[in-house]
Regions:
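Internal, conserved structured core segments that host functional sites
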Residues: 62-132
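Structured loops at beta-to-helix junctions and adjacent beta-edge loops in soluble globular domains
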Residues: 21-22, 58, 69, 118, ...
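Glycine/small-residue-rich interface belts in oligomeric ring/scaffold proteins
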Residues: 11-83, 87
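A general structural signal for short secondary-structure junctions and capping/turn motifs
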Residues: 7-10, 46-47, 56-57, 105-108, ...
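Conserved small/polar residues in nucleotide/adenosyl-binding loops
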Residues: 184-188
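A contiguous pocket-lining binding segment that forms or flanks enzyme active sites
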Residues: 129-170
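Short beta-strand scaffold segments in enzyme catalytic cores
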Residues: 3-7, 53-57, 113-118, 124
């Protein structure tokens, strides 16, 4: 399960804390995070099949991440949809505010997705079901419709909260993102 854990409380020098993984479609060729030549100041991995990305940040502080949402009724129409990785890439390459960007996204042109975008001042979330409010201090996004609770997501959320309530290291966040793999015996 792909996972985005995001907290935006005032944590000392941190504007937000993010921990994320890309945990499916391993056979799909990707390039590890790098500074893109054709987009000034963009640090992101790259989907080598479609050219987009699942998570990226710019030197100016723009951030975006996407997960797919399993909507099996769409599978037979797959060839008619745009790449979800372009949602991230296009936001990071635009000057639109997060609110303006999500208003312009035509969600019906993509297979199921959850997208988080930010300029470090404002955060917005849009899914294939529409624009969502982002007023929580902690957001957990997986491969299901937003606000869907599963054991995997609940466990990851509780572990993330626990880490945030103490002095944490980058390694703590890496271990957290590897941990949900051990939850695979649980039903999503």
């Amino acid at each position: 399960m792909c996972l985005i854990l995001l907290s935006k409380p005032s944590l000392g020098d941190y504007k937000f804390v993010l921990s994320s993984n890309r945990d499916e479609f391993y056979e799909r060729k990707t390039k590890n995070m790098f500074w893109w030549n054709n987009f000034d100041g963009l640090l992101a991995g790259q989907d080598l099949e479609q050219g987009g990305t699942w998570l990226g940040i710019t030197k100016s502080g723009r951030f975006a991440a996407v997960t797919n949402v399993r909507e099996f009724y769409q599978i037979d129409k797959k060839e008619n949809f745009l790449s979800r990785g372009d949602l991230v890439k296009n936001f990071l390459n635009s000057s639109l505010s997060p609110e303006e960007y999500v208003q312009k996204v035509e969600a019906n042109k993509y297979m199921g997705f959850n997208l988080v975008v930010s300029d470090l001042k404002h955060f917005s979330i849009i899914s294939s079901q529409g624009i969502e409010s982002f007023n929580q201090e902690l957001v957990v996004v997986g491969n299901r419709a937003l606000n869907t609770e599963t054991k995997k997501l609940n466990n990851a959320k509780e572990d993330f909260k626990s880490i945030l309530n103490q002095t944490f290291t980058h390694q703590d966040l890496i271990e957290l993102m590897q941990k949900p793999v051990s939850y695979t015996h649980l039903r999503a």
